Amino acid sequence: MSDAPTASALKTPVRVSGPVFFISDLHLSAGMPATAAAFERFVRTRAREARTLVILGDFFEYWVGDEELADPFHRHVAALLAELAQAGTRVLLMHGNRDFLLGKRFLATTQATLLPDPSVLEADGLRIVLAHGDALCTRDAAYMRFRRWTRKRWVQRLFLAMPLRWRLRIAQKMRADSEAGRALSANVAGEPRAAAMMGDVAPEAVDALFKAAGIPLLIHGHTHRPRLHHEPGGERWVLSDWDFDHAQPRGSFLRLQDGVLTAEPVTA
């Protein structure tokens, strides 16, 4: 379950070996077979070049508890991560806003290590602040209220005590409502689907995170707007989402090697 971010997570870096690959927002589900296939190819080819793979949230479209491992699709994806770990690539995982209920059973099955949000990573002589990114969208007051409630452990315990079929229905309803809201926003604003996916981060929240960490380098996902930003507090890299099941397929990862960050495409 989700860990509340603490000041100690920013002051105590997680030290890893490079090359390090960063991905986020794959939103894996059985309903997105081409995206899932792209991830499987990535795990069995490019990801083997990395000593460390960092997944910065929303790895799954939704996750309502570790009973999801009984589902063949989710079990196969978990096996892919375990296969990668057994091949020698360390897997680090951060919760996203869709999969913050990934728990101890999933971590044990995949041999992954959970990162608090935010965290600091140290590799190749660099210190990097890592976040999923949703906590930086502070101008979305309704979402921030929802986030505060759903990260409370007692709320999570109550939800996990429900029958699995109830939890799945709730998640599917929330997913449908979210998609409808995005489509409406895109139509009203006249924006393309990718640009209207969700609200962007608040500059003041980004600045506060830079100051709290004291590190001028940040990597996050969530917004589906991949780009390198030069902020007053430092460089901010935004990771791409992955989608190979709709028009305008997209997907990339960020490589850290020899102290240099580069964005590289993922092939379908």
Swiss-Prot record:
Binding site for Mn(2+) 1: D25, H27, D58, H224
Pathway noted in the entry: Glycolipid biosynthesis; lipid IV(A) biosynthesis; lipid IV(A) from (3R)-3-hydroxytetradecanoyl-[acyl-carrier-protein] and UDP-N-acetyl-alpha-D-glucosamine: step 4/6
Keyword entries, A-Z: Cell inner membrane, Cell membrane, Hydrolase, Lipid A biosynthesis, Lipid biosynthesis, Lipid metabolism, Manganese, Membrane, Metal-binding
Catalysed reaction, written as an equation: UDP-2-N,3-O-bis[(3R)-3-hydroxytetradecanoyl]-alpha-D-glucosamine + H2O = 2-N,3-O-bis[(3R)-3-hydroxytetradecanoyl]-alpha-D-glucosaminyl 1-phosphate + UMP + 2 H(+)
Main location: membrane
Co-factor remark: Binds 2 Mn(2+) ions per subunit in a binuclear metal center.
Binding residues annotated for Mn(2+) 2, in chain numbering: D58, N97, H132, H222
Membrane topology category: Peripheral membrane protein
InterPro entries in alphabetical order: Calcineurin-like_PHP_ApaH (IPR004843), LpxH-like (IPR043461), Metallo-depent_PP-like (IPR029052), UDP-diacylglucosamine_Hdrlase (IPR010138)
GO biological process annotation, one example: lipid A biosynthetic process
Purpose: Hydrolyzes the pyrophosphate bond of UDP-2,3-diacylglucosamine to yield 2,3-diacylglucosamine 1-phosphate (lipid X) and UMP by catalyzing the attack of water at the alpha-P atom. Involved in the biosynthesis of lipid A, a phosphorylated glycolipid that anchors the lipopolysaccharide to the outer membrane of the cell.
HAMAP family the UniProt entry points to: LpxH
Protein name as annotated: UDP-2,3-diacylglucosamine hydrolase
